């Protein structure tokens, strides 16, 4: 089990308190999306792969995506640039509170069902929920849930 930097745990717990998204979900997405913090778009402070909207500060990166049939393809993508990791966790919580993620939120308080409901919505990878669950349980991230209580 990897040791998490204290600022990552604190950011996930604060996002849970504010947005009611389990810290275990945020931590698993941080680990999966950024390779445990090692593979963020350079200069972005964006461990979640959050894409930039018009007017957002951004960095451009070539990414691998997956179509509905499971075939990989590559695109140039503008990722949002954040001032800090804590700001990224806050934006991640806000993002998961958008209507497109209502089905995932309806699965709460079960983080496993929430993770599965993100497949095909948050990420194109058909094994996304399974990957999140493996990280959540393999790293005991559920121990950090409960900041919202």
Locate predicted features.
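Catalytic cores of secreted/periplasmic lytic hydrolases that degrade extracellular macromolecules
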Residues: 1-149
């Amino acid at each position: 089990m990897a040791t998490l930097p204290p600022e990552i745990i604190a950011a996930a717990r604060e996002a849970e308190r504010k947005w009611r998204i389990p810290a275990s979900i945020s931590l698993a997405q941080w680990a999966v999306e950024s390779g445990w913090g090692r593979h963020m778009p350079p200069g972005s402070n964006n461990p979640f792969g959050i894409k930039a909207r018009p007017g957002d500060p951004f960095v451009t990166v070539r990414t691998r995506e997956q179509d509905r049939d499971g075939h990989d393809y590559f695109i140039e993508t503008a990722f949002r640039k954040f001032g800090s990791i804590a700001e990224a966790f806050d934006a991640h919580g806000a993002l998961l509170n958008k209507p497109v993620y209502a089905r995932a939120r309806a699965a709460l308080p079960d983080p496993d069902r929430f993770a599965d409901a993100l497949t095909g919505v948050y990420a194109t990878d058909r094994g996304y929920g399974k990957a999140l669950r493996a990280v959540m349980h393999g790293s005991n991230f559920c121990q950090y849930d409960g900041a919202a209580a």
